[in-house]
Regions:
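Alpha/beta enzyme core
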Residues: 2-272
Length: 272
């Protein structure tokens, strides 16, 4: 039958389920702006995540906590204007769904209406199940996120590997099953042992998307700036640089500066 994602039709949550059933890996990268999203989409990615990691990557914050609903909407609008093929998922930021189900639903509906994204992603397990169900009942596709959940960095005391101990591993499996039964179409598994992630993948119908969770997940996600070698001083074990865009950008800027300083740009052909 060939790969399901190569015909350039719009990827949907239904496509995700079909890909899992067919054994086709799902690819996901983050994007936060129109230009980058257009490049990533045209390259054939299955899904684009407007991550609250924009707080770090775009705004330079130390963690994801400061970013607001308004800021996420701004980034999401920029991305959806560029995307024709990929399934677009947007993170609900910290504080937008933890206070009450009613406030979560209000924020979720606003984000869906004002951005045009295909789904929303929430961090957490059984403790947010009622909220997840409320969103799904309202017709909003929900993408779960377990393991290292960056919005809980202060509770965890850092960004270390999660679920290494039996009790936490068992809870993660229970959380994944609960999210699956609630109707989540996909679940990110972040920085958990590969064997555990593979076991979760076997036990749930939802597509599992790994980041630092081994090859046994149904798909993988990375922050695009990390994957393309644009960030400095960040090289966790799970990260591979698939390009060296940062180096090329530096060379390009240096070439531009040199051309302007020496009078080589603009040339007569580049002038009106």
């Amino acid at each position: 039958m060939g790969y399901l994602s190569t015909d350039k039709k719009k990827i949907t949550t239904k496509t995700f389920a079909e890909m899992k059933q067919a054994g086709e890996k799902v690819t996901m990268l983050t994007a936060y702006d129109f230009t980058t999203a257009g490049i990533i989409d045209s390259a054939g990615i299955d899904s684009i995540l407007i991550g609250d990691s924009a707080s770090n990557v775009v705004a330079g914050n130390a963690n994801t906590l400061p970013i607001s609903v308004d800021e996420m909407i701004y980034h999401a609008r920029s991305v959806t204007r560029a995307v024709n093929h990929a399934l677009v998922v947007c993170d609900m930021p910290f504080g937008s769904y933890q206070i009450s189900r009613e406030e979560a639903l209000r924020n979720a509906c606003r984000m869906m209406k004002e951005t045009g994204v295909d789904a929303l992603k929430l961090e957490g397990g059984i403790e947010i199940i009622d909220t997840v169900k409320s969103l799904i009942d309202a017709g909003i596709p929900v993408h779960g996120h377990l393991g290292l959940t960056p919005q809980s960095v202060n509770k965890f005391g850092g960004y270390g590997i999660r679920a290494k101990e039996e009790a936490e591993a068992e809870k993660l499996i229970s959380d994944a099953i609960a999210l699956d039964k609630a109707g989540c179409f996909a679940i990110v598994l972040e920085k958990v042992p590969a064997k555990l992630a593979a076991e979760v993948t076997r036990q749930v119908k939802a597509v599992t998307i790994g980041i630092g969770a081994g090859a046994g997940c149904d798909g993988q996600v990375l922050v695009y700036a990390d994957a393309l070698g644009m960030t400095q001083g960040f090289k966790p074990k799970f990260l591979r640089h698939f390009a060296h865009v940062g180096e090329e950008m530096t060379k390009g800027v240096q070439s531009y500066v040199d051309a302007v300083k020496t009078g080589g740009y603009p040339s007569a052909e580049e002038s009106y």
